[in-house]
Amino acid sequence: ENFSHTLEVLDNVAVAEVEAIAEGRLKDYVFEDGQEVAKVRTEPYVWLRWAALFHDIAKPSTKRYDPNLGWTFHGHEVVGAKWIPKIFQSLKMPLNEKMKYVQKLVNLHLRPIALVTEEVTDSAVRRLLFDAGNDIDDLMLLCNADITSKNPRKVARLKSNFELVKTKLVEVEAKDAIRNFKNPITGEYVMQLFGIEPCNTIGQLKEQ
């Protein structure tokens, strides 16, 4: 059941990403001349699909039966995220920002829908925006693709909740412009400090 769900999510992600790309709704962030630049995504990002493939990988290991709740999978997103480095290493996949991207989406894939309650605070939304950073749109796409219930009413409810989350994210983001925060340490400063030419390493040094 978990495997079939994963394949369905993977298929949903592939379809949704192609549609989003066609509408110019997704961006990729790259470093050019030491500066982070947002560019409209023009082709599918394979690592988003890897995130979809691995998002529930730890469910079997965290499966527990609760007399009141039935089967639960508490913490499967955290456990799954911890497994990602070893999985990538075993598959001889890159252990760089691509691995970290997949790890981030696996770890955060339950967070958006958890913001649905009326009691949710702006600070909780800010934390999600901060933790997801430039990958918030990919995370939301994955979260939406994860709605695969066979119950039409449940799907309608979850889709409605998801739209509410999107609205809350937009509202808080408009207030704080979190994703528009500019790191005071510029690419030029890093290049001068370390005596290096423009390259991807500059972005990594800025994060340090």
Residue positions per predicted region:
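Divalent metal-dependent catalytic cores for phosphoryl transfer on phosphate-bearing substrates
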Residues: E32-R153
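Long, charged alpha-helical interface segments
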Residues: E1-E19
